[in-house]
Amino acid sequence: MLAFNPLVTALAALIFLFCQANANPPLMQRLVHEYQWKTKQGLPRQGACTPHNLAVRREWSTLDVETRLEYIEAVKCLARLPSIIDPELAPGARSRFDDFQATHIRHTRTIHATGSFFAWHRHFVYLYEKALREECGYTGYQPYWEWSHWANLPITANPLYDGSNASLSGNGVYIPNRNGTLQLFPIPNPSPDTAIYTPPGTGGGYIYDGPLVDWELHLGPVLYSYDNGQYIPPNPRPDGLGYNPRPLIRDFNNTLLQQGASWDIILNMLVNVTDMHEFHPLFFQGPHLAGHIFISGVDNDIFTSPGDPLFWFHHAQVDRIWTIWQALDLETREYALDGTLTLLNCKNLPFRRILAGELTVCDDSTAQP
């Protein structure tokens, strides 16, 4: 079972240095260099963690094919290793990979749109990375996915999900004539009126190429999505933790990245958003959400999204952007939090209005005491 400190301190980010992808805008390059310099300046010259022995996370496209294949094999290894989570907590878990998804399912309502969102997922990615290295022999660190770099390029241009043997497999089979996906949000009394709508993308069915073509999900769904286009058998348990084997669905949609994670959006947040109470909701409903619904499939269920191995690249990038933002004013931002441990700190807030920018805080009538 995975153990968590409820609020992992922001200082934990300093053991990692994120190496940027090629061809980023000059402003982004300057911000990354400033973050890297400040990180190294803040470390002791001697000891267990120095500027000379930092762990470095890299963008997938900058890795050589040998390293990519090593990573893919480690992911498959986690999916082969038996689960160690308490079966009373997650009876459907069959593998070590499932253990991470089960943990995310169990904590979802306290780790999204809450004060613990960034720090909890930082530690979560670290534990997954640690399992890849210590249990499955991976010698690198968790790569990230630079959304903005790929948003305006053809989907197959990204070696992370181009369907090649050195990718994390590609898109799902294209299903035409769909109305999109409606995901109920986990607030009290959810309904289609308080749901997240995802327009149909370029897939919608099961993945059909690449090394994860036989990938099998065992947990979920928790939030059943309407008009998905591909039938998803319901889980035998209402909490989604029962055994429910099925293939992996994807529905890539670059338009969502262009609208939610473009360079303009990312750079505006890094340069102009200086307060955590503004940065958190803007980032959560913008780049964070855009990456998930670009992938779609299991990522259209906020509980079960770690069931797709692309989740870990997405959240490594989430952590990277937060890390850069922190480093630009570390004295103020290192321990800055926004929110409580109650999702949205609301009893029943229409989430669509938040996505549309109409609401960023709860009304007094909906706030938790």
From Swiss-Prot:
GO terms for molecular function: metal ion binding; monooxygenase activity. Keywords: Copper, Glycoprotein, Metal-binding, Monooxygenase, Oxidoreductase, Signal. Glycans are attached at residues 165, 179, 253, 272. Residues 1-23 form the signal peptide. Cu cation B binds at residue 315. The keyword Oxidoreductase applies. Cu cation A binds at residues 112, 121. Disruption phenotype: Fails to produce F9775 A and B, but accumulates diorcinol and continues to yield orsellinic acid. Pathway: Secondary metabolite biosynthesis. Tyrosinase-like protein; part of the gene cluster that mediates the biosynthesis of orsellinic acid, as well as of the cathepsin K inhibitors F9775 A and F9775 B. The non-reducing polyketide synthase orsA produces orsellinic acid by condensing acetyl-CoA with 3 malonyl-CoA units. Further modifications by the decarboxylase orsB and the tyrosinase-like protein orsC lead to the production of F9775 A and F9775 B. The functions of orsD and orsE remain unclear since only orsB and orsC are required to convert orsellinic acid into F9775 A and F9775 B. This is Tyrosinase-like protein orsC. It comes from Emericella nidulans (strain FGSC A4 / ATCC 38163 / CBS 112.46 / NRRL 194 / M139) (Aspergillus nidulans). The lineage of its organism: Eukaryota, Fungi, Dikarya, Ascomycota, Pezizomycotina. The gene is orsC.
